[in-house]
């Protein structure tokens, strides 16, 4: 271990930018980019470096600072405010600090961490803010850290004088390895963090020009962490080809805190060093035959940001009245919630579920930390003539509400149920499929999570094996289309020629509740259980429809439904397979509830997706609305198509430890 450690404060003009109106404090033009400064890491013997967004800022924009590793990784970062008006630190366990200063003054912070040698270190930061001005300003949110190869999003937030409007927002990179900025939406800059030799800052500037001729700018600090991910061709790596982001145990003093992240979300995991259940047991082993307490569940939660764990705990305390979610969670070893987890998935290799934090934010500040980069798989199936739509409704209203990304929106606690309830039922349906209650008593501490699952999975004993065998989906056409829509297979000329009406006929005659069931048998079972539980436990009914592929500018009010149903899960032909799924995966529920499901309601072919919210009676007035689309109309249609991109199945090798051969995993 080295005895001499050196740290330098980067004091060059490239990082210590004076206010002078250039950081959101007024209407002055943006200052010219400063010449690059030498990195403090270039000094021999330096193991870490510190960066600040600027020495002086104006209130109303975000302050930022970072600790970077020069010769290796920084571990266990923790930011604490030590002076100034109180601010919320939502990324306190990240290498990069972001905070919102609403008033002028001096703000001070301490960063505690372990440097690249493992030595405990502490650094103090002081950032001054001038008083909040009344002029035009621009704030970039948020300063943050990302591992190389990760998606990055930064959003620009203009504040304008009354009657003024945005003319342009332009972006420029000021420092760091060159990246390609996607600014097709000028309010957001997207890029992929580049490969770096050491932790490296990237600095962007956005400049606002208004219709009245005013201007303002702000800068943002993004620290790219040097963290090697597992190579895609590394057959022994558990996360080969995947991006694994930084996470930590939500409860640092919990009984499993020391091993949680290492056992379920670490790029270094390999199939020959999986954690044994003696290190991290399934929740069922800890609970026995009872229902887990919220505290027992929270001891298994791993997060990128503590707010995600806090809101997940509120979700359980408020919305798990009947204990279904906690009972289902007995089949997992951990719950990972991350701002870079997209899409959500379950992984039998670790026995954990992985949830997109976008489902759990409540405040605009929490939302600022959630990555906005879309999943590349959203382009699948673009040559087909049809699309499928879905939503959950209560009465005649969709439970999915529009939260304008350009507004500082706060969501109520009920949003946690609306946004995350269906997701939890779906991913936990997968967990129960691979580890049903009937096998809890066979779990052995000496085994691994995958070692406990593999014999049944490879032996064809899962519900996703037995139920489709007894009650199969029979449409080969829909199965083929499922490969196009959910795995990116190229569509054939025949597939591209199918009309929405033809696809609707293929689907309606079969036993699936959603065309996502044709992705894999695992999704078939999870979709069926999800819709049943949403209907019987939460009183939300599911709409599913087939429609023509929407063109540019289409909305829920203009797209025409070719065929659809509300509550397809109540279709009599589906009940035998549903009953078998419930009996195997949710035995605490009386299977007689399957027969108590309401009969499905047919949608009105030829009416719009929005018009079909009112069933069975149509709303008065014209059925198809040709008015100028609103943002909400556009969003509701996007949401109706988007679910598949949040739950995209993705085959990847499972650990070979138990059987010696890989098996396909549904994520």
Predicted regions, residues:
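Surface-exposed, flexible coil segments in extracellular/virion-facing regions
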Residues: 80-98, 173-192
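Pan-zinc metallopeptidase signature
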Residues: 487-667
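Acidic/His-rich structured neighborhood in mature extracellular/periplasmic domains
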Residues: 309-484
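C-terminal edge beta-strand
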Residues: 119-129, 214-228
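Bacterial Sec-dependent N-terminal signal peptides
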Residues: 17-51, 124-126
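Acidic, Ser/Thr
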Residues: 62-74, 155-163
């Amino acid at each position: 271990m080295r005895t001499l450690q050196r740290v330098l404060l980067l004091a060059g003009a490239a990082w210590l930018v004076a206010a002078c109106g250039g950081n959101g404090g007024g209407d002055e033009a943006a200052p010219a980019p400063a010449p690059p400064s030498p990195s403090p890491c270039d000094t021999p013997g330096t193991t870490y470096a510190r960066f600040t967004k600027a020495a002086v800022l104006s209130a109303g924009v975000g302050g930022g600072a970072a600790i970077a590793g020069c010769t290796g990784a920084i571990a266990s970062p923790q930011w604490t405010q030590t002076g100034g008006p109180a601010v919320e630190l939502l990324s306190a366990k990240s290498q990069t600090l972001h905070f919102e200063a609403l008033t002028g003054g001096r703000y001070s912070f301490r960063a505690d961490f372990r440097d690249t040698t493992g030595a405990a270190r502490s650094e103090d930061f002081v950032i001054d803010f001038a008083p909040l001005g009344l002029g035009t300003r621009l704030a970039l949110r948020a300063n943050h850290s990302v591992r190389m190869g990760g998606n990055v999003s930064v959003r620009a937030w203009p504040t304008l004088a009354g009657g003024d409007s945005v003319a342009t927002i332009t972006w420029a990179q000021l420092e760091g390895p060159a990246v390609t900025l996607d600014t097709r939406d000028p309010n957001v800059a997207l890029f992929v963090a580049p490969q770096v030799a050491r932790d490296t800052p990237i600095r962007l500037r956005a400049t606002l020009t208004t219709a009245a001729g005013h201007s303002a700018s702000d800068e943002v600090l993004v620290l790219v962490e040097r963290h090697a991910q597992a190579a895609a061709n590394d057959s022994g790596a558990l996360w080969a080809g995947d991006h694994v982001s930084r996470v930590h145990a939500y409860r640092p003093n919990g009984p499993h805190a020391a091993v949680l992240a290492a056992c379920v979300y670490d790029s270094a995991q390999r199939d020959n060093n999986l954690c044994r259940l003696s290190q991290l047991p399934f929740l069922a082993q800890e609970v026995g035959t009872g229902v887990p307490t919220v505290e027992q569940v929270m001891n298994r939660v791993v997060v990128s940001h503590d707010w995600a764990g806090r809101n997940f705990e509120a979700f359980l305390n408020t919305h798990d009245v009947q204990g279904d979610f906690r009972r289902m969670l007995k089949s997992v070893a951990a719950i990972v919630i991350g701002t870079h987890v997209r899409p959500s998935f379950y992984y039998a290799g670790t026995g954990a579920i992985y949830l997109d934090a976008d489902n759990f934010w409540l405040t605009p500040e929490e939302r600022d930390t959630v990555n906005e980069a879309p999943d590349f798989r959203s382009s699948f199936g673009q040559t087909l003539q049809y699309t499928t739509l879905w939503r959950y409704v209560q009465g005649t209203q969709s439970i999915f509400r529009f939260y304008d990304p350009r507004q500082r929106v706060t969501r109520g606690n009920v949003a946690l149920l609306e946004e995350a309830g269906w997701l939890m039922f779906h991913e936990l349906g997968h967990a129960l499929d691979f580890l049903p209650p009937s096998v809890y008593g066979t779990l052995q501490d000496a085994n691994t999570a995958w070692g406990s699952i593999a014999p049944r999975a490879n032996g064809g004993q899962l519900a996703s094996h037995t139920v489709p065998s007894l009650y199969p989906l029979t449409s080969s056409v829909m199965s083929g289309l499922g490969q196009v829509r959910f795995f990116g297979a190229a569509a054939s000329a025949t597939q591209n020629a199918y009309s929405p009406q033809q696809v609707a006929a293929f689907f309606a005659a079969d036993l699936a509740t959603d065309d996502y069931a044709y992705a894999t048998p695992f999704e078939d079972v999870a979709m069926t259980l999800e819709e049943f539980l949403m209907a019987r436990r939460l009183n939300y009914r599911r709409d599913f429809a087939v429609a023509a592929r929407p063109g540019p500018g289409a909305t829920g009010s203009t797209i025409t439904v070719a065929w659809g149903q509300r509550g397809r899960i109540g279709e009599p032909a589906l009940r035998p397979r549903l009953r078998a799924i419930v009996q195997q995966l949710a035995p605490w529920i009386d299977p007689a509830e399957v027969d108590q499901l309401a009969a499905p309601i047919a949608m009105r072919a030829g009416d719009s997706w929005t018009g079909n919210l009112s069933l069975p009676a149509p709303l008065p007035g014209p059925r198809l609305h040709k008015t100028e689309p609103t943002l909400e109309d556009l969003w509701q249609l996007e949401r109706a198509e988007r679910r598949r991109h949040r739950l995209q199945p993705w085959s990847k090798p499972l650990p070979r430890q138990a059987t010696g051969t890989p098996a396909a995993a549904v994520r």
